[in-house]
Amino acid sequence: ATVRNTCYDYAAFAEKNSQFVMSSAVYATASGQEISAVTIPEECFQDQESGANLNPVVLYVERVVAKVRVKLDSDALETKTITENNQNYTMVALLKDNEKGNTPDNYLTVDGKQVYAKFLGWNVTAATERSSLSKFINPQWNIFTGWNYAPYFRSYWALNCEEAGTRYMPLIGSEGGYSVVGGRNLGTSYTSMYANENAAANSNFTNGLGRAYPSTVIMAAQLCDAAGKPINAYHWLGQMSVGEESLKTAMLEQLGRIDSKLYAKSVEGTQTVIKEIAEADLKMYTAVEADKATLTPEVTGRYYTYVMLSEAGEAKEWYSTPECTPESKMDKKAVNSFLNSTLGAAEIWNNGYTYYYFPIRHLGDKQNNGNEGYYGVVRNHIYQVNVNKVVGMGTPVYNPGETIIPEKPDNSDTFVSAKINILSWRLVHNNVELDWSVK
């Protein structure tokens, strides 16, 4: 029992050693009995090798890990390849409307330039950090049809170990750490990686429902023009444009239109100088940095960016009137609160960084339901993903080093279409459309 309960990062072991661990197949009999080991018949014990060879023990084993494979569908997407620093990248022309195809009037543009997604890599996020050596099931499960098939000595669902954990990652990480870009290249040929089992949580033992946060394929990209140059796009107050400096200028213009102002008092030589807030006083912060969101799946809006005082701005004295009276003095917190309430949040694709994602479907394309087993990763399966449509600009990333818990913007016009297959290894196909179109 101790060996069977061993909980370990078998996916990392497989990635590091190019080998995977196997264990006895686990399944349920027709009478509802769990089979997790093989009984060795008496006749298999022989005192001669020749006799043992005539009476072998029949074992059924399965890989402890799953495999995920992803590619871009060159037949369905408009793609081009560019080379940067001896590295090939696949660029995909982005669409505006999911209902339309690859037609000139449906290509997405910003400031008159057609926008491409230059894919930098992919990884599996929200994945479990560990899985058990031997699969655990509830033989009494009455869940999706075909979850168990005794004649093939197989079952197609599982319980996570108690120490499974959950791993999230940034777009670009430090050396040796997990990151989206540090996963696998994403192009028009399949690349693959191993993944730990991530099916049912122990708290859902009786009904076998999947985890609230299933393993998810996440794809890193840069928004680029046709030559591969990143587009620093932003979306603010319903307007889409390019350049962080342009955004700050627009925000200052907005402040100039309202009655309430911000004034800084400083001494230059022997003169007391009073100036309205300027671009050098402002800096953009992620929602997490601005304490507007936390890195927890239950919280949304992590993709937003907020303008607040820069270091230079924090060093100044701020007032709400040009007279700079003691009564009108504002501390840093009050100034930032005023900026947030007056200007709101922006979406900034800093250096063009963006991401697309989708949960891995365990039942694949042929089972169209959102119930038990629809999402999940089970050992000894291959989840084969074919991305055949990319609509919209993805979820904006301002700080590529900040941990990402995937989410789609509320006004998103982005969509990803993909197809997943699982391989004996059991193969599950996922055809996926990445749809981030504005609703």
List each language-model region with its residue ranges:
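Tryptophan-paired
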Residues: 1, 67-71, 75-379, 434-438
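Ser/Thr- (and often Asn-) enriched beta-sheet segments in non-cytosolic proteins
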Residues: 2, 36-39, 44, 58, ...
